[in-house]
Structure formats: structure tokens, C-alpha cells
């Protein structure tokens, strides 16, 4: 790094005390050249050309397209001076951000030279921003980002933040060879990464089954004889009192064709930020409750492989079922630390009665019972020592603002349009609650005036 911008970038790294791989300080041209010249990529090029009767030059051009699409160029000033500042403003306009650790000492014991990979549940497109924001002082995270963000200006923004794009559901072997070699390249160079094992946003609020592609790519880096580090997977659980895209996700669960366009999703977030900015100026700011992040106990890949020797040497059809055990362990660890914020707790309590009109006193009593049960399984209840009436008041502000529940006398009425959203939020903690209500589709029938149907369990993809 030379010149004024280079010196400013180095000062920023020291200011944030960030964990940044030297690999990120080189120009993207070097990474692209290394990836294009990879022997395994060349082998895949020859195979693809032969199988599809294409010239070597034609396939090479396709590889160059994939490389340009995948490889980012981190701009440190963009990430920290622009990205961090905007994240701080946006998140504080929308939420109260809470961070907790299951074993902070274990995270601090990870050797500095080892590779850290954050594995997160996927609740909202805001997940990227929340986790990057809370980790900014100490670590830069390179995300695997879906094709939804490949639209101007998001594509440029994410690439300047050091994130790389992946085509979900794209099965071409040539593409996956390029992607795998890129993931192995950044892992070998110690880049801190973040990915979502579920591979997509949760449409019904529940934790989804893990996908194995990126996990396999990261793990197989250890097969390189020159790679002498350990890889640590850190479980990260995220939850919100309000997911900005919740209604769109529910509709998409019912009909995949009802998925909003990329610009529509961006416009939704921008609308919420803009409206809250106006409220801030006019003194009427109404945040959307909590955005909570919990970090779990890290898992050492070396230790896991010691109990499953030779797994990574197996052919793919035998290797992936074994790696599924590691993925299941990650999801179990993530599920155990999902933050219990006021709205999911209140939603679970309301729906556990399976009726429309419920005495408020009974709801508060049920919330107390549920919180006790959550405590018994060591669940991460946000501000667990707060009195239940105060927890209800925080949840009630959101439920009333969104017209999900109304109060009449000493009773609470669950509105027809509110029930699917209550299910969506209760589902986020359903795996922690051994009670009848939030573990199954809550209501077999619905009032006819609702425009959102009862949530059915999302099918694995």
C-alpha cells in the first residue's frame, strides 16, 4: 500500500484492530491470475470442452467470466469508513443491537494464524450487515453472497467489502471447480469468512437443513500439504423482533413465483430506513425492537477430523454424507444459541393457546412459563432478568404497530392477518420449546379474510 490512500487504509486497520489477511492487501488481478492458472481449473476446462464440443478458447472465456464474477476487490476504506458508518446509522435507526457470547474465552484462544469461518443462520438480508457491524472491531468477514445482490449498486458495494458471489442452484461442474478453487485459495491465505449453511433465507421462520457445498470446499483445503493451519467454525445465531422481509418470505413459501425482484427487496429496506430517519428528525423514532447476535463455542476442524479420519479423501458420493454430520453439528450449535427476543417469546405464548381471544394475564403467565423452560435448556434469552410485564411491553409495541394483536378490556385478540406472522416469529424458537403450540403448524384452518395462509413446514431443497 502506497500513497495517501494506502497510509489511510493502514491507519484504519490499526484503528479497528482488525484481523485482516495479507491476501486482501493485494490487487484482485493477482487472485484472478492465480485462479485462472490453477491446474484443476485447466483440467475442468479440457473436460468441459470435450463434453460439450467447444473450443478451448471458448471455455477459457467462460472461465474468465466466472472468475470476474466471483473474485472481489476489497477496499478497506470502503468497508470501514463507508460501510461501517452506514451500518451503524442504519442499524441504530432500525433496531437495538444486542451481542452475547456462549464462550468468549474460547474465541479468544483461537490462534491468530488459524482460519476462522463464521457459520450463521439466515433470517434476513440484514444478517450480513448486523454480523459485519458487531465484528468490525477485530475482524473483517468475507461473505458468500447469493445472486440476489448482483444488481447495481449492490454488486459493486459487496465486492468492495471483500465478499464473493455464488450462483445458488447452478450445477455446472466447470463453474463449481472455479468456485471451489477460489474458496480454497482464500482459505489457504487465512481469509476470515462468513457463510449461511442453510443456503437461503428461512421462509417459515424455522432453521432449515444445511447445504454442504461451501462447507466441503472449505474443509478440503486441509488436503493441501502446504496448509498447516487449523480451521475454526464459529456458530453464529441471529434473531430479530422484526424481519424486514417477513411478509415477502411468507408469500414466497406459498408460491415461489411470488418472490419479489431484487430492486423491490432493496426498495423495501430503503423505505424502512428512510421512514425511520424522518421519525428521528421529527422526534418520533420507533425502532423495530431487538436485533440480537449470539456467538457460540468454536469447532476445530482438526479435532473433528481426528474422530473421522480419512473422510476428506473419500469420493464425493461417500464424503458428503459424512460431512453432513459436521453440518448437523454446526446447525445444532447454532440452534442452541438462537437469541430469544421479546416478539418471538410473546408470539409463542399467544399461539400456544390455539384460540383467538386470550386473557392478557394468561399470556403473561405463559410467557413466564416459557422463559423458565428456555432457562432449563440454557437458551439465550435476551435480557433474561427483565420482568415479564416489561418484556411484554416491548413485544406489544411491535405487535400493536404491525396490527397483529389488539387489546380489548382484559383480553387480547389475535387478528386474522396477524396469525401467519406470529407463527413466523414463534417458529424461530420452536426448536427450543418442548410444548405443543409452536412445534407444529399452529392452526389447521384460517379465518377467510386473511391474505396470508397458515405456514406449512418449508420443504428441504
Language model regions located:
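Membrane-interfacial terminal anchoring regions of lipid-handling membrane enzymes
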Residues: 1-461
Amino acid at each position: 500500500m502506497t500513497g495517501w490512500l494506502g497510509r489511510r487504509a493502514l491507519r484504519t486497520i490499526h484503528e479497528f484492530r482488525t484481523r485482516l489477511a495479507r491476501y486482501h492487501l493485494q490487487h484482485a488481478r493477482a487472485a484472478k491470475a492465480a485462479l485462472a492458472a490453477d491446474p484443476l481449473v485447466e483440467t475442468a476446462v479440457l473436460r468441459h470442452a470435450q463434453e460439450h464440443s467447444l473450443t478451448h478458447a471458448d471455455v477459457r472465456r467462460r472461465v474468465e467470466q466466472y472468475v470476474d464474477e466471483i473474485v472481489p476487490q476489497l477496499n478497506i476504506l470502503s468497508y470501514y469508513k463507508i460501510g461501517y458508518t452506514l451500518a451503524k446509522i442504519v442499524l441504530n435507526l432500525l433496531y437495538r443491537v444486542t451481542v452475547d457470547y456462549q464462550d468468549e474465552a474460547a474465541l479468544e484462544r483461537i490462534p491468530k494464524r488459524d482460519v476462522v469461518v463464521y457459520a450463521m443462520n439466515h433470517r434476513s438480508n440484514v444478517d450480513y450487515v448486523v454480523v459485519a457491524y458487531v465484528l468490525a472491531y477485530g475482524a473483517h468477514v468475507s461473505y458468500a453472497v447469493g445472486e440476489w445482490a448482483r444488481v447495481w449498486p449492490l454488486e459493486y458495494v459487496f465486492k468492495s467489502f471483500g465478499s464473493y458471489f455464488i450462483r445458488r442452484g447452478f450445477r455446472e461442474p466447470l463453474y463449481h471447480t472455479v468456485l471451489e478453487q477460489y474458496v480454497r485459495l482464500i482459505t489457504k491465505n487465512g481469509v476470515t469468512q462468513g457463510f449461511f449453511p442453510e443456503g437461503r433465507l428461512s421462509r417459515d421462520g424455522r432453521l432449515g437443513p444445511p447445504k454442504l457445498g461451501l462447507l466441503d470446499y472449505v474443509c478440503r483445503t486441509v488436503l493441501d500439504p502446504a496448509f498447516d493451519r487449523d480451521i475454526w467454525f464459529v456458530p453464529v445465531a441471529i434473531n430479530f423482533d422484526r424481519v424486514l422481509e417477513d411478509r415477502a418470505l411468507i408469500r414466497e413459501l406459498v408460491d415461489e413465483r411470488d418472490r419479489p425482484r431484487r430492486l423491490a427487496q432493496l426498495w423495501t429496506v430503503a423505505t424502512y430506513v428512510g421512514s425511520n430517519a424522518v421519525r428521528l428528525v421529527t422526534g418520533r423514532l420507533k425502532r423495530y425492537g431487538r436485533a440480537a447476535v449470539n456467538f457460540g463455542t468454536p469447532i476445530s476442524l482438526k479435532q473433528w477430523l481426528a474422530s473421522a479420519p480419512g473422510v476428506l479423501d473419500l469420493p464425493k458420493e461417500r464424503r458428503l454424507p459424512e460431512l453432513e454430520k459436521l453440518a448437523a453439528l454446526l446447525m445444532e450449535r447454532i440452534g442452541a444459541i438462537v437469541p430469544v427476543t421479546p416478539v418471538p417469546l410473546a408470539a409463542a405464548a399467544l399461539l400456544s393457546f390455539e384460540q383467538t381471544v386470550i386473557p392478557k394475564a394468561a399470556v403473561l403467565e405463559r410467557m413466564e412459563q416459557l422463559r423458565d423452560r428456555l432457562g432449563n435448556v440454557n437458551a439465550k434469552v435476551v435480557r433474561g432478568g427483565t420482568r415479564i410485564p416489561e418484556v411484554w411491553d416491548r413485544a406489544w409495541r411491535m405487535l400493536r404497530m404491525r396490527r397483529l394483536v389488539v387489546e380489548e378490556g382484559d383480553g387480547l385478540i389475535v387478528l386474522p392477518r396477524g396469525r401467519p406472522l406470529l407463527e413466523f416469529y414463534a417458529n424461530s424458537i420452536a426448536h427450543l420449546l418442548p410444548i405443543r403450540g409452536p412445534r407444529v403448524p399452529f392452526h389447521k384452518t384460517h379465518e377467510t379474510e386473511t391474505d396470508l395462509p397458515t405456514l406449512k413446514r418449508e420443504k428441504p431443497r
